[in-house]
């Protein structure tokens, strides 16, 4: 693990100081490279499918990512299409064009993408932060839920409070919120029959345009956050290449 930490340090220094540098790998666009560093796992390429359990953290960057196994530590995944099943033993960080979550998460979950879907099989023990263009939450959060997007659809369960910033909020009949719902948007939300919001609804009127092009809106926030995640994953990608090229490091 010491070799990998050294490689990460060198990679981070390189990425921080050489902004114009890029690395390419010739071959099939679906080809992937995976490496195990102690208990930690790194996967990069056109397509990464994680089906074996990981005893530590997992760092994945690919055009298509599919996870159907247990990750005992943190999971960091960035790609065009990201599908997460199985379980995460600590925190989850995911970013992509389309992100689908159907997993057990022991820690917190932070997800950003163009289309973010949290399925009904999802149980998150900690807090949840969702940012994107279109967000659907049908899961179960034992903590706090924060969602920012052009459109947000809630039809899941939140044990704590929920805060939503969106141009359009749809509350489904299966919605269960143990605390209060704070909504920032152009019009007051409609709470359908069957939905339960124990702490009531607190509405703050906001202009719809804020959610599309304002610097503080979810689109801008998504771009910034995805950029940060990609840089972080890029450090581990570069570290992987360091150890492949210089195995004696």
Predicted features and spans:
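Intrinsically disordered, low-complexity terminal regions
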Residues: 1-249
């Amino acid at each position: 693990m010491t070799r990998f930490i050294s490689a990460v340090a060198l990679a981070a220094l390189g990425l921080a100081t050489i902004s114009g540098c890029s690395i390419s790998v010739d071959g099939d666009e679906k080809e992937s490279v995976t490496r195990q560093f102690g208990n930690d796992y790194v996967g990069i390429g056109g397509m990464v499918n994680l089906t074996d359990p990981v005893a530590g953290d997992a760092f994945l960057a690919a055009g298509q990512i599919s996870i159907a196994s247990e990750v005992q530590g943190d999971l960091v995944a960035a790609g065009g299409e990201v599908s997460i099943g199985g379980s995460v033993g600590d925190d989850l960080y995911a970013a992509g064009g389309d992100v689908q979550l159907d997993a057990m998460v022991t820690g917190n979950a932070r997800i950003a993408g163009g289309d973010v879907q949290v399925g009904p099989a999802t149980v998150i023990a900690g807090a949840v932060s969702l940012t994107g263009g279109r967000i659907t939450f049908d899961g179960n959060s034992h903590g706090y839920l924060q969602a920012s997007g052009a459109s947000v659809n809630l039809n899941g369960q939140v044990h704590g409070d929920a805060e939503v910033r969106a141009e359009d909020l749809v509350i489904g009949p299966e919605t269960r919120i143990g605390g209060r719902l704070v909504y920032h948007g152009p019009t007051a939300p409609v709470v359908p029959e069957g939905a339960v919001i124990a702490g009531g609804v607190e509405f703050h009127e906001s202009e719809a345009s804020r959610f599309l092009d304002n610097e503080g809106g979810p689109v801008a926030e998504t771009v910034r956050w995805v950029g940060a995640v990609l840089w972080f994953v890029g450090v581990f990608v570069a570290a992987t290449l360091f150890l492949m090229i210089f195995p004696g490091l």
